[in-house]
């Protein structure tokens, strides 16, 4: 089945090398050499597609859950400056030096983030967390996939954002952060790299 799916849009493209739905070319290398290769299988049922975001704590991929038959987002714990990965490999390795304690502390925080966000269930403007697991010397959070445009990409294409538009983007973020803070949780990774603008 994986060979018939487009690794960008997850439509069934059949044996075509170029997806007739989105134009993605099968076998396209990841944008960064340390990203997982599209087509990689995680936990025996998540097919990794293209990376859709990268922040200080990790890489987010668009993936296909073969068990449920739905597109999900998978955030991989990949803390910048602490780990590396050879192109085409799945496992991460710690950079040299005394990074083990720092890595373990951040990994624990990453997994606690998954548990914390999962308690919000279907709260408006907060992405649902479905599951999390450890593999490949790192960890993964399985989340709801939100179809939209990254704020970073929007700003790069459109330039300056009009004040009314900015307020419409920022207001739901403020409301979501209020809900999170009310539970004693601090979101440490709010940035244009992980804010989606959706319809």
PLM features per residue range, with description:
Residues 169-170:
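Activation segment signature within eukaryotic-like protein kinase domains
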Residues 197-199:
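Activation-loop N-terminal segment of eukaryotic-like protein kinases
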Residues 132:
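Activation-segment/catalytic-loop signature of the eukaryotic protein kinase fold
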Residues 173-185:
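Protein kinase catalytic-loop region centered on the HRD/HxD motif
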Residues 136-150, 154:
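Conserved short submotifs of the Hanks-type protein kinase catalytic core
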Residues 86-119:
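AlphaC helix of the eukaryotic protein kinase fold
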Residues 64-72, 78-82:
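Conserved N-lobe loop of protein kinases adjacent to the ATP-binding glycine-rich P-loop
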């Amino acid at each position: 089945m994986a060979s018939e799916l487009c690794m960008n849009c997850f439509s069934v493209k059949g044996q075509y090398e170029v997806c007739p739905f989105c134009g993605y070319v099968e076998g396209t290398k990841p944008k960064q050499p340390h990203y997982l290769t599209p087509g990689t299988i995680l936990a025996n049922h998540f097919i990794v597609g293209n990376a859709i975001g990268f922040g200080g704590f990790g890489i987010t991929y668009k993936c296909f859950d073969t068990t449920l038959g739905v597109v999900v987002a998978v955030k991989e714990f990949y803390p910048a400056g602490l780990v590396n990965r050879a192109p085409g490999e799945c496992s991460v390795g710690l950079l040299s030096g005394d990074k083990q304690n720092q890595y373990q502390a951040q990994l624990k925080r990453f997994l606690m983030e998954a548990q914390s966000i999962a308690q919000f269930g279907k709260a408006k403007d907060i992405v649902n967390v479905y599951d999390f697991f450890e593999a490949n010397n790192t960890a993964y959070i399985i989340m709801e996939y939100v179809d939209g445009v990254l704020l970073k990409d929007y700003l790069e294409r459109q330039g300056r954002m009009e004040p009314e538009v900015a307020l419409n983007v920022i207001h739901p973020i403020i409301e979501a952060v209020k809900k999170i803070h009310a539970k004693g949780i601090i979101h440490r990774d709010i940035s244009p790299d992980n804010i989606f603008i959706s319809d």
